[in-house]
């Protein structure tokens, strides 16, 4: 494990009976980088994320996060060690306000209990942390809105605010721009770029939009049938004929061309 390695995956596999969802993945993630994970549907990307975040236990292999062996640990333990993730579908409390959603995440990070009865007298530090995150993500003007009434793009931003509220060092974003308008997609791209520039976060990003991938990624991991096909710089992946023809298709290959 090199000094700048934050996540080391060795021989990671997950089989469901005879189905090999993930097979023998080796990966070293560097502190501060944004690494994109791409591949066709069924390539094993979601299963891989579920293994990293503790939602699934590996069939074999190991996962090391900094100095910790996190192989098979439950999600709440992995989160407290510094790994947090978003989901492809919004995972927020739609009947609560935007601020309350973030306060719940801040409270969980502090290992305290959320109590509706004490909402008016909530811990001031929790409120301050939540308000700071909402301001950072340009959501302050929506703080008192019920989360279920805001736009889809803003809901995605609220979920990212909740992810950041856990104070992670490694952030797993699962298709963060799925279903978004071009303007909303642009907001997410700029947000991830801004957060990456702070040096506080390392990002793994799964994404089907190749323009988003090439806008954000320092390196790209291509998965196919649960295995690692290639891991390299964007320009190398962009030029790889096997990736272009066999795993992205003609339309996606066109999207990989420089603008």
What is the role of each PLM region?
Residues 2-259:
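Glycine-rich phosphate-binding loops of nucleotide-dependent enzymes
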């Amino acid at each position: 494990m090199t000094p700048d390695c934050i996540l080391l995956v060795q021989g990671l596999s997950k089989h469901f009976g005879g189905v090999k969802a993930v097979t023998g993945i080796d990966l070293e993630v560097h502190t501060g980088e944004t690494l994109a994970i791409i591949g066709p549907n069924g390539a094993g990307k979601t299963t891989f994320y579920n293994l990293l975040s503790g939602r699934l236990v590996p069939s074999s292999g190991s996962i090391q996060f900094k100095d910790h062996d996190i192989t098979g640990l439950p999600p709440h333990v992995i989160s407290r060690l510094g790994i947090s993730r978003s989901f492809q579908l919004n995972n927020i409390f739609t009947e609560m306000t935007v601020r309350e959603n973030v306060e719940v995440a801040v409270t969980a990070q502090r290992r305290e209990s959320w109590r509706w009865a004490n909402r008016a007298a909530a811990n001031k530090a929790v409120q301050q942390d939540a308000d700071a995150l909402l301001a950072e993500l340009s959501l302050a003007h929506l703080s008192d809105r019920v989360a279920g009434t805001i736009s889809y793009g803003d809901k995605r931003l609220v979920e990212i605010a909740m992810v950041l509220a856990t104070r992670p060092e490694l952030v797993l974003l699962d298709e963060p721009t799925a279903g978004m308008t071009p303007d909303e997609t642009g907001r997410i791209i700029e947000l991830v770029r801004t957060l990456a520039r702070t040096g506080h976060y390392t990002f793994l990003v799964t994404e089907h939009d190749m323009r988003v991938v090439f806008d954000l990624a320092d390196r790209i991991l291509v998965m196919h049938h649960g295995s690692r096909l290639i891991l390299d710089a964007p320009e190398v992946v962009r030029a790889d004929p096997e990736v272009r023809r066999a795993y992205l298709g003609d339309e996606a290959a066109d999207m990989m061309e420089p603008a």
